Regions:
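Internal alpha-solenoid helical repeat scaffolds
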Residues: 5-9, 26-29, 34, 38-165, ...
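C-terminal non-catalytic interaction modules
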Residues: 2, 276-423, 430, 464, ...
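Residue register of alpha-helical TPR repeats
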Residues: 9, 49, 89-95, 134-137, ...
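Structural register within alpha-helical repeat arrays
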Residues: 14, 34, 47, 54, ...
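Core solenoid repeat modules with strong leucine/isoleucine-rich periodicity
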Residues: 500-609, 613-860, 865, 880, ...
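Short coil/turn connectors between adjacent alpha-helices in alpha-solenoid helical repeat scaffolds
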Residues: 16-27, 56-70, 85-86, 98-115, ...
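Amphipathic alpha-helical segments of tetratricopeptide repeats
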Residues: 32-39, 72-83, 117-127, 156-164, ...
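Residue signature of alpha-solenoid helical repeat architecture, marking inter-repeat boundaries
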Residues: 5, 45, 131, 168, ...
Length: 1000
């Protein structure tokens, strides 16, 4: 706290500000400081408020030892000066007897007699105050359930009583009753009791997160697997990193351990490492540690005891080491509770959890399903391939010669040989063979550098690839191999050309590179056929890449000319790999030239050749291209078949014959065209994981971003959030080492998912942070405009209209630098509706100012469109949305409609209706109707027109009391829509007309 409050007004302001903070040490320390400040004032009432805030901070900050001490001070004040406590303060005081009971129960050092004495005091106080005793019996039952003695009687004494205003909330009592049935072994009855909470009908600060954590295993045991999965995702988010809900986190870890999700369990454990240090409640700590031990025990039993695990701060842990530590601490805590209670109940329940067998072998909890092998420090081993790779020779000379022979063919097994040789050469005791056939060590080092350069190129590290190829060329020169040197320099040219940015620059670089390549080729003599074919292929590739960037008709013929040279030469010398490679490039060139049928014909001929003559390892890549051509020809099913076959065949080959992640992404695209988005989502996440295993992290995170957006589009909000939470927790992302824009995109999608999941507070905080960061993106003001606009809408939904206006102004300023007409106009209209809806007439001027801004942006869009500078798609926000207000809700549809002018007119109508300016509203809505015109039988905006008519009828008939013209309008619209076959759209109009007639 910067400065202590100097008067009681400042104290109350500080207490209110602290109340808005999340529970934790910051809030608790501030509450302690405010109590110190309150003690300086002569008035005792501010001290009461400060003590109440401090007790709340201790209670929900998991510091049960301190809560009773604070309450004792409050009780003394009440006994000494009861008149200081108004009705609200008195209510809070008697409510918190239960908090103290709960706090004392969590402390094994408090004797059982002390707990019973407190319950007696609570009963006597309640009786003296004339309060019902149901809350007292509720606390007595909780103590009985904790000790395991006389539980049935205590339950009946509590559950049979009528609730009072001091009873715990419905959600908490539901959880308590359900847990009673759960302890008795009746899963079905427990779940039936829980249903209102699990369905979201009853909730509080701790619910449904607490109930969800207990219900997960019963749901599995009763076969409700999918619901358990969904509730795990939503429920975990409600308790993670929260010291007062450490037990709930422990049960989620246990759920992961018993469903084959041990890797996710370790990930969640790392996310909650703070709970080892921040949980001051022994009972909560025991609950958490037992869940941790269930997880670690399972991981260790699967043979992964040496995996790293996140544990108590101050040292590094393995799974086995942490399990031993956790077991010791948890056993000690359980023993202390049982000693206090005089029973073995706590230890017995702990043992029952540890003895549970897995309930499912493998439940796919999240879109990012990972195994323990995936989280191991060492690179995961590749899955066994159906095709058996040729054995790597044992003799060093044979191995070197074999690698070169395979490399000459372009065989995928080459990589395994080079990898083995790289390890051998790096050994301190390496001795190079004295074999003329093998050649000198410098030649082998050149070979290895060439392979390393190829790997860099596969990871799109073109600068590194170019440098390594040049270095390899120099070594080949030293070894007396000018042909190899020429190929390396040619490949370096290609890598350098990849580094150019922008289509024009890239085309120029590729043209120059081709000239240099031809000169290099012509100046190198004595080339063996396979090397000459490689140089010819490089020449054709450079021109093919130029065509890809320019799509210029004049660049088509030169590519085919080079390909003709390659095909003639490779056919004459029977260089099979370059024949098929050239034919593949020929098909690609036809596609780039816009002749997809010709491209498909070329591919079909090539596939026939490959199946009869080989090389077989070219089949996956060729099928992949064929699939992409089929997509271009609108045959998604044929494309899917080709991609699936390519993926199957690619698994038969080692190395990087074809990029499996690209094929998986292609499969996802085909699935989207086939209307199978859930399958597409699975392929996208597999593609991302494949890229991660290949250490292509940027590609992986881009694909994860696409998967997250798709899951959000599909309404799988919790899946989206869980996926992004996992990705954002990756070490390089968390450390800020990933590209900041890509990280921002991941966070932006997560913020949108939080909003869709109705976690408005978290979504607003993330959007505000992103808006602040993106304000510094001088090279990308358009993105800042979009983010700031979305932030403004969220702030408006939260009622923070001053901050919303600031964010909207930022968006408008950024929009001037990089126009985002559609997005910004949409946000401004939504803000107008929000402010008018929430503030009524008081908010009308500010709301109309937003619409004026939206109108100016619409004018800009129209001018830009007419000038050919931008194509701005108009949209109509008219939405047939149910809401409490007669004139609809503030939601703005993104459905495209007839005109932006119509959209603005409609919004003016809604905003003025919210602001009770009904004449202006009616005029605007009639204008919107006129601009829309009556829909025809095929128009898909009939529903929007009907909603506009309905709102006009509401304003005219209900608010302005002009029933007759309103009925005329409504009846005419119903007749028109019925005649067109739009019966569904007539229902709200007919309902409004009936209401108006009833009120006549």
């Amino acid at each position: 706290m910067p400065t202590a409050p100097q008067n009681t007004d400042e104290l109350y302001q500080a207490l209110q500000a602290n109340d808005e903070r999340p529970y934790g040490r910051t809030r608790t320390v501030t509450a302690e400081e405010l109590v110190d400040a309150a003690e300086q004032f002569e008035e005792p009432v501010p001290l009461i408020h400060a003590l109440l805030e401090l007790q709340e901070a201790y209670t929900y900050g998991s510091e049960p030892r301190k809560s009773p001490v604070v309450f004792a001070r409050l009780l003394n004040l009440f006994d000494e000066q009861p008149d200081l406590f108004d009705e609200r303060l008195r209510y809070m005081l008697f409510w918190r007897f239960k908090w103290v009971s709960n706090a004392l129960r969590q402390l094994p050092e408090i004797p059982l007699t002390g707990l019973n004495q407190w319950l007696t005091e609570m009963r006597e106080r309640y009786e003296k105050a004339g309060l019902g005793l149901q809350p007292y019996y509720g606390e007595a039952y909780q103590l009985a359930a904790h000790t395991g003695e006389d539980t049935t009687l205590a339950y009946e004494l509590w559950a049979a009583r009528t609730r009072t205003r001091f009873s715990d909330c419905e959600a908490c009592e539901i959880c308590r009753r359900a847990c009673h049935h759960l302890t008795a072994g009746d899963d079905e009855r427990a779940l039936a009791v829980w249903e209102p909470v699990l369905a979201g009908k009853e909730s509080c600060q701790e619910e449904p997160a607490r109930s969800v954590s207990y219900a997960l295993l019963p749901l599995l045991r009763t076969g409700r697997v999918e619901r358990a999965r969904e509730l795990h995702l939503a429920g975990y988010r409600g308790c993670r990193r929260n010291p007062s809900m450490a037990g709930e986190v422990g049960r989620h870890l246990e759920f992961c351990a018993l469903t084959g999700n041990e890797a996710r369990g370790l990930e969640l454990l790392a996310e909650n490492r703070n709970l080892f240090d921040e949980v001051d409640s022994p009972l909560e700590q025991l609950d958490f540690l037992t869940g941790v031990e269930v997880l670690l025990q399972r991981v260790e039993s699967l043979g992964h005891g040496e995996l790293p695990a996140a544990g108590h701060p101050g040292r590094t842990w393995t799974v086995s080491g942490l399990r031993a530590e956790v077991r010791t601490r948890a056993d000690d805590l359980a023993a202390r509770f049982d000693t206090r209670n005089g029973t073995t109940t706590v230890t017995d329940r702990r043992r029952a959890r540890l003895d549970r067998a897995p309930l499912l072998d493998a439940l796919e909890l999240t879109l990012r399903t990972r195994s323990l092998d995936d989280v191991a420090p060492a690179a995961p081993t590749a899955a066994p391939a159906p095709r058996t790779a040729e054995a790597v020779p044992e003799s060093l000379s044979e191995l070197i010669l074999r690698a070169r022979a395979l490399d000459e063919k372009g065989h995928p097994d080459t990589r395994a040989c080079w990898t083995r040789l790289r390890t051998l050469v790096a050994a301190p005791d390496y001795t190079h063979p004295d074999d003329p056939a093998v050649g000198p060590l410098v030649l082998l080092r050149a070979d290895l550098l060439s392979d390393e350069a190829s790997q860099a190129g596969e990871k799109d590290d073109h600068a590194e690839a170019a440098a390594l190829h040049e270095e390899a060329a120099a070594l080949y020169e030293d070894a007396g191999e000018p042909g190899h040197a020429a190929v390396e320099r040619g490949t370096a040219l290609l890598a350098e050309a990849e580094r150019a940015e922008g289509a024009e620059a890239k085309a120029a670089v590729l043209t120059d590179a081709h000239v240099t390549m031809v000169r290099l080729h012509e100046s190198t003599t004595g080339l063996p056929p396979y090397q000459e074919a490689r140089l010819l292929r490089l020449r054709a590739t450079l021109l093919g890449m130029r065509l890809q960037w320019t799509r210029s008709e004049e660049h088509i013929a030169p590519v085919f000319a080079e390909l003709d040279l390659l095909h003639t030469f490779a056919t004459r010398h029977d260089v099979a790999g370059q024949i098929s490679g050239g034919l593949l490039l020929r098909a690609t060139t036809h596609a780039l030239a816009g002749d997809l049928p010709a491209a498909l014909a070329e591919i079909d001929a090539l596939l026939e050749r490959l199946r009869s003559q080989g090389p077989d390892w070219h089949l996956p890549r060729t099928l992949g291209l064929r699939g992409r051509l089929q997509l271009g020809l609108q045959d998604a099913q044929a494309a899917y078949t080709d991609f699936a076959e390519a993926l199957r065949l690619s698994g038969q080959w080692q190395g990087d014959t074809i990029d499996p992640s690209r094929l998986l992404a292609d499969l996802a695209e085909a699935c989207m065209h086939l209307g199978r988005p859930d399958e597409a989502l699975r392929h996208l996440t597999r593609a991302a994981e494949t890229d991660l295993r290949r250490d292509r992290r940027i590609d992986a995170f881009c694909t994860y971003s696409n998967a997250a957006r798709l899951s959000l589009d599909l309404g799988r909000v919790e899946d989206c959030i869980a996926l992004l939470d996992s990705v954002l927790a990756e070490p390089d992302v968390a450390a800020g080492e990933l590209d900041d824009r890509l990280t921002a995109q991941l966070r932006l999608t997560r913020a949108r998912a939080l909003r869709a999941g109705e976690d408005l507070k978290a979504a607003t905080a993330e959007f505000a942070a992103l808006a602040a960061e993106s304000a510094g993106w001088d090279d990308d003001p358009g993105s800042h405009a979009m983010i700031a606009a979305e932030t403004a809408v969220l702030l408006g939904e939260s009622g923070e209209f001053d901050r919303a206006r600031e964010a909207a102004d930022q968006a408008i300023a950024a929009h001037r630098l990089a126009p985002r007409h559609e997005q910004l106009s949409n946000s401004l209209r939504e803000l107008a509706c929000l402010q008018a809806q929430q503030q009524g007439p008081d908010g009308l001027p500010a709301a109309l100012a937003y619409l004026a801004d939206a109108g100016r942006i619409a004018d800009e869009a129209r001018i830009a469109d007419e000038a050919g500078e931008a194509r701005i798609a108009d949209e109509n926000p008219i939405a047939d949305e149910a809401g409490e207000a007669e004139h609809g809700t503030h939601g703005v549809s993104e459905t495209r409609g007839p005109s932006l002018d119509t959209a603005l007119a409609y919004e003016y109508g809604r905003v003025n209706a919210y602001g009770r300016a009904y004449e202006d509203a009616l005029a605007a809505l009639e204008k919107a109707q006129a601009l829309l015109g009556e829909p025809g039988p095929e128009d898909d905006w009939a529903g929007q027109w009907a909603e506009c008519v309905r709102l006009t009828g509401v304003v005219e008939g209900l608010y302005l009391k002009r029933t007759a013209p309103a009925l005329t309008r409504l009846d005419a619209a119903v007749s028109h829509l019925t005649a067109l076959g739009h019966e569904e759209e007539t229902a709200p109009l007919a309902s409004l007309a009936a209401r108006l007639r009833d009120e006549e």
